[in-house]
Amino acid sequence: PVENGLKFHADWLKGQKTGFFIDQRENRALLEKYAHGRDVLNMFCYTGGFSFYAMRGNARSVHSVDSSAKAIELTNKNIALNFEDDPRHKAFTVDAFKFLDDIDGQYDLIVLDPPAFAKHKDSLRNALRGYQKLNAKAFEQIKPGGILFTFSCSQVVTKEQFRLAVFSAAAQSKRKVRILHQLTQPADHPVNIYHPEGEYLKGL
């Protein structure tokens, strides 16, 4: 398949959703505009969508991280499909929290697009703590003047709850933070006003 001129492999049968998160395509295109000259970290990279948009946006370096070896294999295939053996890209099979603990302020654009932290309301409290912890680590590690793209795809987490978790993380890290964009799913993923949970993708 092709998205905005970029080719990608997708596992239609065994992959998550359709094998490629098409609901993030507008957000990937937005990231491309900010990537020029930056050192980019794509956490929970899955098939590497944000990574190859960052590559096309002339990022200085792009590092893709996922705990799944299969996801990293697919990311590397997609990078090679578009950029051959471009040395700007490196991929790591490791837990996201551990990776963030071990880096030392080397990235000035970080993407946090984790799988759903909560699928049921009884998991909501733990999910919000998880979002706060993850974003706090990113705020602590990002370079001054850096840009963070952060998302939640948990239906049971409202936009307001996610924002509060991110704001709490910013306060905890004692970093000055401004919102540049409020992000969501594209128009072909409409939200029924009688089913607000349909607005499952929230981002800043």
Where are these regions (language model features)?
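Conserved SAM-binding loop of SAM-dependent methyltransferases across substrates and taxa
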Residues: T47-R60
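S-adenosyl-L-methionine
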Residues: K70-V111
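Non-catalytic substrate-recognition/targeting regions of SAM-dependent transferases
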Residues: P1-F21, A29
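Mobile active-site "lid"/loop adjacent to the S-adenosyl-L-methionine
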Residues: Y107-K137
